[in-house]
């Protein structure tokens, strides 16, 4: 049992203890205030000094306590935090007579200390594990989408940019032919790659500038531009456009199809609120949380629209930051990929991942569908299926799914299906002569293994706890703390906001357990025997 009346001995960033003579409220602290000081005491704050240009008036440790406390109170704006520093007795006690920092100092501190904020977050998580607040056996991962600060109509679509870049390239090739006709170039554009065309047009532009023509000559009725000046303007405009297109394509990258002009890190994606899938795409980030015993033990951020590629980065970060290794991993069907299964098993994790066909596979319609390869007889040694009519369906090709990274085989019936009495039930809307389908055999086997794990007694218990712990953290952040849109531009600053919110949720949960004297065992719902 914990003694909540015990005083907290304050210390500075170097760990030197002191007794405050300015508004010392250590004996009158609220449970969440006392818990915050307890968890923040004795951490390594040395990394904060490296990002400050001069010695700050407010100690980095005190500034971190002030910001986390403000997030716990639901105040995330730097101006609101500044007002809180002048009025809140707890923060005044933490400042110990030092003038309250202004909003610029607070904002600059959060902006420059993103990595240091992440470091103390994981220091606190390790401390929670050391005092027995975490189960340290099963980790639950889930993700959500939070809207970026970027404007809603600032979208840049990769396909549209690529299409315009192709048109611009064709125009530049025509302009090179025009330069040849004017005697400004002797290079023929036919058969040349675009890099050579681009370099030659830059030379043409320089040659026109050397002619001493009036490149800014006015245009309009009664004025005729010199053909070389007209060519110069067209070349300059298209060269600028092709540079802009190349920069946009490079910023978007290979793994996404859009970005925002005002926040290039954000990707336009469909939000969770758009259940009917008829709303507007919004610039947002994919935020991931790993939970254990109702505490958030890990956070990542990405611009992926799905959760396929977020499992491995999260587990790599947990292995790097935490002082222990989990044995079980649990997630929903959004993480159901071969790549994730193989990584988890290769690194010693037992994957409790719900298959994407978990619900539909239980229906009578699914189980009685003779056209699905899952319901056909499969010869694993010779790699072929046998349909409901006893005909052989052999493998004729293979491929890899770009989204999930799963390999699949292409199977086709060795005989024509014309005249088969089961064709209408087996092929339904297909107009092909013979049965053909793609079968993810490797993924199929992994799903069978995952289904067996999830249907075991331990799997049922883990699934029940997943719905409580993984979803509960988002309920605190998005529901109670009203985090629906980030207030900063860029992925790094958005991630700092997310970390601070996760930090605040952890402290509040620890305070509730400490106040209710529930610190003996980690949160875990045990399945009662029937």
What is each residue range found by the language model?
Residues 1-30:
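Hydrophobic alpha-helical membrane-insertion signals
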Residues 5-6, 10, 56, 67, ...:
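Anion-binding and metal-coordination hotspots
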Residues 26-68:
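Basic, short loop/linker segments at the boundary and entry of helix-turn-helix/winged-helix-like folds
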Residues 91-95:
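Short amphipathic alpha-helical interface patches used for protein-protein assembly/oligomerization
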């Amino acid at each position: 049992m914990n003694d909540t009346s015990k005083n907290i001995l304050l210390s500075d960033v170097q760990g030197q203890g002191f007794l405050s003579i300015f508004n010392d409220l250590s004996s009158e602290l609220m449970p969440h205030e006392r818990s915050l000081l307890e968890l923040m005491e004795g951490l390594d704050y040395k990394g904060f000094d490296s990002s400050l240009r001069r010695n700050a008036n407010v100690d980095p440790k005190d500034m971190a306590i002030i910001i986390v406390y403000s997030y716990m109170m639901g105040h995330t704006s730097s101006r609101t935090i500044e007002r809180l520093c002048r009025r809140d007795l707890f923060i005044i006690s933490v400042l110990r007579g030092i003038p309250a920092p202004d909003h610029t100092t607070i904002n600059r501190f959060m902006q420059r200390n993103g990595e240091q904020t992440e470091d103390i977050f994981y220091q606190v998580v390790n401390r929670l594990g050391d005092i027995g607040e975490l189960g340290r056996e099963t980790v639950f991962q889930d993700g959500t989408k939070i809207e970026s600060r970027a404007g809603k109509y600032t979208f840049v679509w990769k396909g549209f940019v690529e299409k315009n870049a192709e048109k611009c390239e064709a125009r530049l090739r025509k302009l090179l032919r025009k330069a040849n006709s004017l005697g400004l170039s002797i290079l023929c554009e036919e058969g040349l790659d675009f890099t050579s065309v681009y370099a030659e047009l830059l030379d043409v532009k320089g040659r026109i500038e050397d002619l001493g023509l009036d490149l800014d000559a006015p245009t309009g009725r009664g004025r005729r531009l010199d053909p070389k000046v007209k060519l110069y303007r067209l070349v300059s405009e298209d060269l600028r456009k092709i540079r802009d297109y190349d920069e946009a394509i490079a910023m978007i990258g290979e793994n996404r199809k859009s970005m925002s002009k005002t926040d290039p890190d954000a990707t336009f994606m469909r939000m969770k609120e758009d259940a009917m899938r008829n709303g507007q795409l919004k610039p947002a980030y994919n935020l991931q949380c790993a939970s254990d015993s109702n505490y958030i033990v890990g956070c990542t951020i990405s611009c992926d629209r799905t959760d396929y590629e977020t499992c491995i980065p999260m587990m790599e970060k947990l292995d790097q930051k935490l002082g222990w290794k989990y044995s079980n991993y649990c997630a929903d069907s959004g993480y159901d990929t071969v790549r994730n299964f193989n990584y988890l098993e290769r690194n010693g994790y037992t994957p409790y991942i719900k298959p994407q066909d978990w619900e539909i596979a239980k229906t009578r319609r699914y189980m009685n569908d003779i056209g699905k390869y899952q319901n056909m007889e499969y010869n694993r040694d010779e790699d072929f299926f046998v349909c409901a009519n006893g005909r052989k369906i052999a493998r004729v090709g293979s491929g890899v799914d770009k989204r999930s990274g799963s390999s699949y085989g292409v199977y086709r019936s060795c005989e024509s299906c014309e005249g088969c009495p089961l064709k209408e039930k087996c092929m339904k809307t297909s107009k092909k002569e013979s049965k053909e389908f793609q079968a993810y055999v490797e993924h199929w086997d992994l799903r069978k293994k995952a289904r067996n794990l999830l249907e075991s007694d331990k799997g049922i218990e883990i699934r029940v706890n997943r719905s409580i712990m993984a979803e509960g953290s988002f309920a605190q952040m998005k529901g109670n703390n009203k985090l629906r849109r980030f207030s900063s531009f860029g992925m790094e600053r958005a991630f700092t906001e997310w970390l601070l919110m996760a930090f605040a949720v952890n402290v509040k949960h620890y305070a509730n357990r400490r106040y209710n004297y529930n610190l003996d065992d980690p949160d875990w719902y045990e399945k009662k025997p029937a």
